[in-house]
Amino acid sequence: MDQGQTLSRLLDSYGTDARTRAVAAAVGAIAEASIEISDLIGQGALAGITGAAHGASNADGDVQKDLDVRAEAAIVAALKNVPYAALASEESDTLLMGDPQAPISIAYDPLDGSSNIDTNMTVGTIFSVIPNEPGVAPFTAPGSCQLAAGFVVYGPQTSLVLTLGDGVDIFTLDRAAKTYRLIRERVQVPADTAEYAINASNHRHWEQPVRDFVDECLAGTDGPRAKNFNMRWIGSLVAEAYRILTRGGVFLYPADSRPGYGEGRLRVLYETHPMAFVMEQAGGAASTGRERVLDVVASTTHQRSPLIMGSSDKVHRIVELHLDPAAASRTAPLFGRRGLFRT
């Protein structure tokens, strides 16, 4: 693709059959809705946008913010002419059913991280497009079946990260032209970055494998990884993912012992599946700690899952620690500064 090529031009040339045309239509519609959402976020209180609760609760039990509701409305309106069988939204208790013969279904989180609005932090939109098989219940396939996935980051610039199953491209919103333009193509997760992201305040609730990995990072040059690490925690899934695509590293949102966190906190259909698809398409990896995220099959619309994503070597190390409890003690003396291979 040419640098600066518009997203609409890419989508116009994508696919020749009904399913791929529907994928292009869905991505284009979500992109159009995201421009409206970006404008609303940019105006903030001037447009009546705040992080104040709207009063109702969404399907996840979170109190909806005003912008959650408006973002949901924008996406539903944008998708009205897209041939879909079902929509699964973070903001809806039930599926929104369309044409059962349509070639695709779509899952999305219209505004991920809306609690960040009042503090002027990054928020985003996440989406996943999957094939629909008439006669088969929607959203019952593993994440590896996704046709397209991506997310929009509403930050200093509004950027759209997209995979159509053949690599990852990043587009940035040209506000004057109200269109997305390509800025990076065939993005690859940097392999060797000394950064990890986790909410360290929950240390006492983590499983031992997570503690072991973080302890390895904290040990720095004296530890088994033989390098100093920086910890990042933005509290915004889309921002964490964008940073990893740009700088590498690993993000952990594990299951833990707190009530309601035993299966993780992020939702499979519209958070962990699309993020995992993007990461793998960019040469990274994504796991629950014990299972590849793209092998997970959701049994309910809002099923939760742990998510560990980023540079493959770090994700694989965390998986090793989960699957082999002896891995932590076996590795530490071999590679530490004062271990077998260092003096």
Curated annotation (Swiss-Prot):
This is Fructose-1,6-bisphosphatase class 1. The lineage of its organism: Bacteria, Pseudomonadati, Pseudomonadota, Alphaproteobacteria, Hyphomicrobiales. Mg(2+) 1 binds at residues 90, 109, 111. NCBIfam families: PRK09293.1-3, PRK09293.1-4. Belongs to the FBPase class 1 family. Substrate binds at residues 112-115, 199. PROSITE patterns: FBPASE. Its EC number is 3.1.3.11. GO terms for biological process: fructose 1,6-bisphosphate metabolic process; fructose 6-phosphate metabolic process; fructose metabolic process; gluconeogenesis; reductive pentose-phosphate cycle; sucrose biosynthetic process. It is found in: Cytoplasm. Homotetramer.
